[in-house]
Amino acid sequence: MSLNTSSNATPGDTQRLKNASLDVKQMLKNETESDIIADLRKKLHRAKKEKLEMTTKHNAELSSYESQIARLRSEVEKGEALRQRLEYDLAVARKEAGLGRRAAEERLAEAQRIQERLCAQNSELQGKANEIEKTFQISQEKWREECRRFEHDLEERDNIIQNCNQEYESLMQEKTRLQKTLQEILEKHEQEKTELESRVRETALGEFRLQTEEWEAERRELQLIVQEQDSAVQSMQKKVEQLEAEHMDCSDLLRRQTSELEFSTQREERLRKEFEATTLRVRKLEENIEAERAAHLESKFNSEIIQLRIRDLEGALQVEKASQAEAVADLEMIKNEFKEVESAYEREKQNTQESCAKLNLLEREYFSQNKKLNEEIEDQKKVIIDLSKRLQYNEKSCGELQEELVMAKKHQAFLVETCENNVRELESILGSFSVSAQWTSGVHKDKDKPPSFSVVLETLRRTLTDYQNKLEDASNEEKTSNELDSTKQKIETHIKNTKELQDKLTEVHKELSHLRAKCADREALITSLKVELQNVLHCWEKEKACAAQCESELQKLSQAFQKDSEEKLTFLHTLYQHLVAGCVLIKQPEGMLDKFSWSELCAVLQENVDALIADLNRANEKISHLEYICKNKSDTMRELQQTQEDTFNKVAEQIKAQESCWQKQKKELEFQYSELLLEVQRRAQKFQEIAEKNSEKLNRIETSHEQLVRENSHFKTTLSRTQREQTCLLAACALMAGALCPLYSRSCALSTQRDFLQEQVNSLELFKLEIRTLAQALSAVDEKKQEEAKTKKKTFKGLVRVFRKGVIAILAANRLKLLGQSCAFLFTWMESCKEGIGMLVCTGEPKDKRQFPKHQREQLRCLQALAWLTSSDLLGTVISSMTELQEVISKTDPNSRICGHLLIGAAKNSFAKLMDKLSSAMASIPLHSSRSITYVEKDSLVQRLARGLHKVNTLALKYGLCSHIPIMKSTAALQKQIFGFTQRLHAAEVERRSLRLEVTEYKRTVHEMKKELDKSQSLQTQLNEFKHSKLITHEKFESACEELNNALLREQQAQMLLNEQAQQLQELNYRLELHSSEEADKNQTLGEAVKSLSEAKMELRRKDQSLRQLNRHLTQLEQDKRRLEENIRDAESALRMAAKDKECVANHMRTIENMLHKVRDQISLSRTAATRNDFTLQLPKLHLETFAMEGLQGGPEVVACQAMIKSFMDVYQLASARISTLEKEMTSHRSHIATLKSELHTACLRENESLQSMGSRDHSNLSVPSRAAAPMDTVGDLLPLQAELDTTYTFLKETFVNTAPHSLSSQSSPGVPTNAKRPSQIGL
């Protein structure tokens, strides 16, 4: 039954399946058809959009090209304006050149006249100069005779001065010799002082007091000697000053004469300067003439350059015109090519969009990855640089620290040595002073103990304070002596200053008298100048006649000016006719009318008028050309509409063909779907079998998973335990390392200090041996006692000292034995860099302390080491002690301060616990040092040995049986011997003083001899005075001769005594001779100067005469100059009147120019204010009344200007009428274009409506609303075509180039892109 039912069911199922498959296929077909239709519509819309975009781009490019054409036209117009300006500048330059030429010719004529007058004056001046030279030669001969007399007097005085100088230099030589002897004595003292300090530092301070007292006495004696010598030198200086005063009187006479000569030379220089000034004026006039000639040539050259530039500009204009024509041809070629490019552009557009999208994605990915890689590389580089910098810094700091450590150690050792040496030296030095008696009485009670450092310092302070007080007294005395010397010098300088002031007063009185004489001369000059003034007045009357001639020339010039004005009037009439015929607006020249001459202005105006008429004709041609272009564009619009209709028909045919293809594809898809259903059923059976197998595998995996979970829990517990142990051990190791390293560093430092102290002890012993040897070498007494002591010492050594050595050796051996038994060490570690510093590593306490043989001991040692290294008790103690620290570590925050304090406290507690437990484990190694206890015990063996040694040493000292003499005795012996040396030195100094007294006696005898020499010199001076005075009698002369003979006898006796000093005086004489030779040279130069001065006086007199003549000539020239200036003023007044007339005309023209500017501004404002669609150029009306009211009362020039303005107004009205007609035509064109646009827009809307109706019919049977709505959304994409741009009118191009773009129409959809908006119309 079941089989039958299954067989009946299968055909029904198959039929249902077939029906379902058919329904599905139909649905798919309908869906595919609707999708295809929607896609096609979208493509259609896209094509239309692209077409619109192409048209907009085409319009945009056209507008850009047209704007370029407009720019080129503007540039051409600018070139023409520039040419006009250059022509205007050329005319101005010609005018200025003509004026300059006339002025230069007039200046040349004036300069020639002045040159002729100056030549005549020059000849007169030359004659006067010859007369002055003759008078100057006569005065020169007289002056030479006076100079010769004066030279004889000077030679006699110089001889006297030379003798005085020789004596003064001999005394100065003696003074230098005495100073040298003093310096030698002082040097000897210093040498002796250094020798004594090197030999005996200990007794230096004691001797210093005595020596300072002696030196002060010697210094005072030397000062007295020096003062005596200074007094002698001062007496000599006074004599020399007297001689110098005489010499100064002579020099004053010379100075007066030189001052007179200088005055004459100054006067001569003034005259020369005035003469040079006149010559310079003449030269300047000549240079001005030459400069004017050069300026004239330059103006000619500049005019030629301007003409060349104008030609170049004309050539450039022609080139630009040719380039414009080429540009127009290129534009037409580009338009043809653009149509061909549009077809290719549509094909390639799709490919480029896809490739651009892919490219953009790839570029974004590439840039993102590149940025990431660069950032990573930069971060790594920064990290590397930072690390390298830190490494270098750490290496440097490490090296510097090591160097500083070594230096500090060396410095510390050196300081310790120096400190000890200083203490010893201080002790030895202070022992020899009187202050040390108190110290020794207070300190040397215990002879065995050395003196303390504080006591030594106190004694030093006392001694130093005593010496400081004495030094201050000595320094105060020296200061007072220095102050006295300075006051003496100031007094001497004041005396000299008073003398100099008196001399200057006398000179001033003399100059006053001289100036009064000059005033009298000047009054005579004034009288002569008055006579010359009368002559000048006659000349002025002559120049009045010249002025009358100039006035007649001015009248002639005014007649020529009237003729020019008549010519200008005729030209203006012709210009008016041109303007009436042309009917063109003209721009005024830019504010330079007052520089033009009438002929030049007329030429420029005529050229401008011709150019403007030509521009008007060109503008008319352009308007006709633009109308032709508008017609062509309307034809192209019609053609585009036809092409669009053709494309729509083609698209409809393509849609029908695609519908037939879609039906075929629908049938094929139904067949494929049925085959796929059968394959799905087969695969479902296979997948059921695979699922059963997988369920069995899952059960097995679950059992294995449970086992793995158990193992994992076990491993986690073990791992947590090991982690705890590891952390505890790590903390313990860290704490132990922190404790061990500083202990080890301290032990190293202690070892180095121990070595250093050992070296110091050795050096101390060596120092003691040296002191003893010194004492033995110096004291060669009690040799027999020493020999007896040596024999007793040998016996003493053999009995006691040998026994003590044996006892100490036994004690050391027992201690070493005990240490070896108690210590359980593993090994000793030695640092490689620091040799000799070792570290002992021990094991825990051995349980049984029995004695074993050697081979068993080694085995036990290995077993103990192994048990200690792998002991569980030790691990337990470490973990138990570190539990508290582990708890704190787990809870700590690195940022909080409280946690830090808790962590340090926990570490401290755990370390204390660990050390307590380790001390109980390692009981064999004593942690606390017991050395201090053993040394402190009263009945210890070490203290007993020390007491015994002390007793033996005291007994040996009593009987003199000690092997080594104590240091205190040796130092006392040294002090005694040093005291003996000082006594000997004292005796030697007493002998030295006696020798000094002998030297002073010798010097006194020399001083007496000098006094006699002074007397002889005074007699010689008196003799010289008698010679100079003419009223000396014969009896006085004989008495003076007798006195001189007596003085000569005395001098002979003195020379017998002074033969020893003759050698030193010879050197001084040699120097004096050199000085005298120099003075002789100076005297010769003075004589030559006097001669030159006399010659200069003669020249000055001659030049005075020549200057007077020149002054007369100058007054005449000045009068001529005044007359010429008056003539120039008259001419300038006439020119000013003409300039005023020109300015009146120019002002009138400027007012007209301002009015025209206002009109231009109104035009531009009306353009900007106007709307975009209804723009019309409305020119403002200019009333003739405004210009007529501004009419000026003037000559024919003003009337001609007013006539020209009226003609301009007529032309302006004609132009405004023509422009209004053109604007009306443009408005009619605009209305036509607007109607065309509205028709186009309605046609496009109709097409869109037809497309929408077709779409609604196709989608009426379908149930998918989203796809049916798609074409409705895209309706807005179909837009009307835009109109192309209208061309601009050149006359108003500059004001409307940058206007805003127009919208196409008010009904355009919002989906249009911004690029599609173009300006509708630009221009008139």
UniProtKB/Swiss-Prot annotation:
It comes from the Eukaryota. Keywords: Coiled coil. Residues 1301-1324 are annotated as: Disordered. InterPro entries: CCDC171. Residues 1301-1312 have a biased composition (Polar residues). Residues 29-296, 325-393, 453-521, 599-712, 981-1145 form a coiled coil. This is Coiled-coil domain-containing protein 171. PANTHER family: COILED-COIL DOMAIN-CONTAINING PROTEIN 171.
